[in-house]
C-alpha cells in the first residue's frame, strides 16, 4: 500500500481516545469515534529530513494516518477533529475489509497567525483493493510534495494544466461545487413552478448559471 520510502516509516499506534477525551467534543462525534473507528496507526512522517528534500514554506511535515474502520464509511467530522488537533498536514488512509481509500484536506494556516490550521475542503479517492492504492512522492520541497498529493487524490476535480496554484485550483473547484448546487436547486424549483412566466424567468437564470459553470 502506497509504496512510500522506508525512511519515512513511523508505524506507531495512536489510541483513538486521544482525539476526543478531555476535549470539547460533542457526544455525537464521540460516538462516531467509538462506533466507526477500530484502530489508528501513524504510518509515515513525510518531512524534509525523511525524504531528503528541501523544507517547504507552508508545509513542514505530512503525517500519514491509517484509520481502520469497522465498516467502509466514516463521518467527515472525524477527519476534521483529527486535523484540528494535529498541527501538521495529514494524509488519511482509510482501510476496511481489504480495501483502502485515501483522503486529504486542503489545509491552510488560520488567519489568526497562530499555529492552528483550517481545512477548507477534503478530497478522496474511490475505494480500491489495498495493493492498488499507490501515491507518488513528487516535488523538490515539502510544499510541492503536498500539492502533488492533493492533486493525485483529487484527480479530475482539480485542474492541473493551467499553471494555476493549488489554492486557485481549490477555489475554482469550490465555485464549481456552489454553482452545481445552485443549478440543482433551481431545476427542482422550476419543476414545481406552475406559472409559465416564472418558469421562463427561472430558465433564463439557469442558462446564466450553466454558462458560468462552463467557463470555470
Predicted regions: what they are:
Residues 67-70, 113-115, 162-163, 167, ...:
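Peripheral peptide segments
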Residues 196-207:
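Short, charged, amphipathic alpha-helical segments
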Residues 176-179, 183-186, 206-216:
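Amphipathic alpha-helical coiled-coil segments
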Residues 1-97:
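N-terminal, leucine/charged-rich tether regions that mediate assembly and partner docking
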Residues 75-164:
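Extended assembly-interface/linker segments at domain junctions
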